[in-house]
Amino acid sequence: MWRSIISFLFFSVALCQPFLFQKRSSNISDFISFNASLPNVTIFAMGGTIAGYASSSTETVDYAAGSVGIATLVDAVPAIKNFSNIRGVQVTNVGSEELTPANVLNLTQLILAEVAKPDVHGIVVTHGTDSLEETAMFLDMTVNTTKPIVVVGAMRPSTAISADGPMNLLNAVVVAASNRSIGRGTMILLNDRIGSAFYTTKTNGNMLDTFKSYEAGFLGMILDQRPHFFYSPATPTGKVHFDVSNTTELPAVEILYGYQGLNPNLAKAAVDLGAKGLVLAGMGAASWTDPGNEVIDGLISNQSIPVVYSHRTMDGFSDYYYNGIPSYFQNPQKARYMLMLSINAGYSIQNITDIFSLEY
């Protein structure tokens, strides 16, 4: 009983620490360990299943996401210290469905400050998988650096038998610490596979191998704690950089879902509620109904609302549709952030169309 109480108190105190690594050196800021021969990697923790806690080791569904602090996660993987010096920053600790553009903007600005430090080799972000690809895409478009940025999550909570989080975290640090990872943009890493933030997406709500990059393919894989890349360093075709270093708020952009008999007035309602742009998750390769297109045309012509036509299918290509902006290869959730950043930069509808078309 007393052991349980002590464990609970330790766990509760750990969650309250804003910066969980406090071991310091006179020369090194706040790395948990320091070996001059190893690269420095900073881990920004956002929460999610990788930081999830359940009352049973067999429970993989009914658990509390974002319950374990970054110090506890790192302590579970002592081998990390063999590959890099680690500094941990607990940014937030929630399920990723609760994250907002404000949270992602804050994370981005923290990372911008970190990669500007000459002694920092790479960045790891621990994150819930539900919206992981959105944050990764945002970072890929806003952090202009050749330093490795790796976004990692897990499909089983930290308390589960055979939890995938510890190995995923170790692999993410290995990739962030490797010179082979330089110049590849933001990467997503789970289940031993390394993917581009631009083209990797979550495809299954439950399975460990949920993250896929169907058409573009993976960048590489982890073999025996070594990153093996299939190609020389490169970034996605048409990748655009947006400066958000002084941005305090992003414009609202809503996603509307296409289906038989959709209410065409939902688009107008979204704009009336404050949306500055829309992304349509259209049927097939971005099809939208005729009544719906009439409303969209009015919003574009009369109110200069930029509207991106994307696809609700798992993968594919959305070419030019009506008077809107085709998303080409981008799915709705990633196209939303690209549109938000474009509007924030003050680009016209034609400018935004050109930005989306660069990858084609």
UniProtKB/Swiss-Prot annotation:
GO terms for molecular function: asparaginase activity. Residues 1-16 form the signal peptide. GO terms for cellular component: cell surface; extracellular region; periplasmic space. Its main location: secreted. One of its GO terms (biological process) is asparagine catabolic process. Its EC number is 3.5.1.1. The keyword Glycosyltransferase does not apply. Keywords: Cell wall, Glycoprotein, Hydrolase, Secreted, Signal. It catalyses: L-asparagine + H2O = L-aspartate + NH4(+). Glycans are attached at residues 27, 35, 40, 82, 106, 144, 179, 246, 302, 351. SUPFAM superfamilies: Glutaminase/Asparaginase. Belongs to the asparaginase 1 family. This is Probable L-asparaginase 1.
